[in-house]
A protein has these predicted regions:
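Repetitive, compositionally biased segments used for assembly/scaffolding
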Residues: 1-161
């Protein structure tokens, strides 16, 4: 990856960064984005890539690797940057704060996207929304989720709200 960390931060990008400094892909639900973790055809979203956290045989995806979010004991999981801010980590380690479980990352992004974008849409187009339920689901997906927590603005970037 040719773009440096400082550039990504100044652009307010949302991405994963391995604890050894390797860029692990853009946090995006868009499967067409070239560096999206949702694009199964690229090196960041492929289950076969040596630098994908989705590859259970790579150092970034193996349950036995200290750099993997799937290691339930790791203290060095991938870091989550949302809109250029370091907000937490991607990890199965339940003892870490501000963590998102890698198995529900897409769901977390989808729910977050709905929560943040709803106020900007025309309300009459949507059914009644149970905000308490949405908040509880957010808490389940990210235990540290709060009303001031991190939520997705769109499929390509996030924002604190």
């Amino acid at each position: 990856d040719r773009i440096g960390l400082d550039t990504r931060i100044s652009r307010k990008e949302s991405f994963l960064l391995a604890n050894d400094g390797l860029y692990l892909g853009r946090l995006s639900l868009n499967t067409s984005t070239p560096d999206s973790i949702s694009n199964n055809e690229n090196i960041y979203g492929s289950h076969f890539s040596s630098i994908s956290f989705k590859n259970r045989y790579s150092i970034y995806g193996s349950p036995s690797s200290s750099l993997s979010p799937y290691n339930p004991n790791t203290l060095t999981p991938p870091v989550i940057y949302l809109r250029g801010e370091k907000i937490g980590c991607l990890s199965k380690n339940v003892n870490l704060t501000n963590r998102v479980d890698p198995d529900v990352l897409n769901e977390w992004m989808i729910i977050s996207d709905y929560l943040i974008s709803f106020p900007y849409r025309k309300i009459h187009k949507f059914p009644i929304v149970n905000w308490e339920l949405m908040y509880l689901v957010g808490q389940m997906l990210m235990p540290s989720f709060k009303t001031t927590g991190v939520i997705v603005v769109s499929d390509n970037f996030f924002r604190h709200h």
